[in-house]
């Protein structure tokens, strides 16, 4: 009889202990998640919305935009402004994740201007104009004329991309970044200091091999010798030579070239000749000079075609922006918008 009593007692103790043993590891895990160091910053990502479409919420602020067509300032709700920029700056045929990346860049660009101590304003009462001097913006009526019968489906696609990133911007060390972008790289993006004047830690050269599939990857321009000399302010030596490319940048663009003893920057050559990029090769054939370029744009920041090809391979908007903008976070724009409203 006693053995049975002991057996029953042991079973009772075991029944009481098992739930406690099972629960303890989960309590420890919850505690570890809660007890973070003070000031810990969680990096945000953009969640993919499968099935249900995101809803575009009312914008907390408006952007005063100088409309060059009628010479007036129009106050456009922030997210509506981003829609007009994405629709104008990136082909609507691009993949949704690429359009989201463009929306993040566009929103970051304007929020950065909002909180800047000094900004180049096109007209009194405006923050930006609607040209490429800032960001190209088109209204819905303009887009309707441009898209015709495709207007409804195109607008829906762009709106979904903007809604999927609404309220989010790109930051570095808790500040909105210089979210520069361009059409097509030569296979690499460019260091900021190689094209502009100052180094920017998140704008560093990265590989972008997908761009070789872009329809804008290669281009050719032909100049007469007199035209070439006049545009660059040089005199060519000999009958068959042009000059020597003497240095290239980290992004494989021309840094410097020498033409008959005169040293020129690759960027200056590009701009004076109206070339698509500063990655070029030249060849003289009698009285003409043929220049072949790789890529389209300054090369600093996000390649739009590269972003689209990444999206085609299944990469997310987070993957895209963190590839082209090194070390950035995806952050809420609210605190920056509050500062802007306080300044007003």
Swiss-Prot record:
Keywords: Sporulation
Region (Disordered): 35-59
Name this polypeptide is given: Stage II sporulation protein D
UniProt lineage: Bacteria, Bacillati, Bacillota, Bacilli, Bacillales
Bias-annotated ranges (Basic and acidic residues): 37-51
Keyword Protease: no
One GO process term, biological-process aspect: sporulation resulting in formation of a cellular spore
Function: May act at the level of sigma-G activity or its stability. SpoIID is probably required for engulfment.
Residues passing through the membrane, by range: none
Presence of the UniProt keyword rRNA-binding in the record: no
Gene Ontology cellular-component terms listed: outer membrane-bounded periplasmic space
InterPro entries: Bact_Sporulation_Assoc (IPR051922), SpoIID/LytB (IPR013486), SpoIID/LytB_N (IPR013693), Spore_II_D_firmicutes (IPR014225)
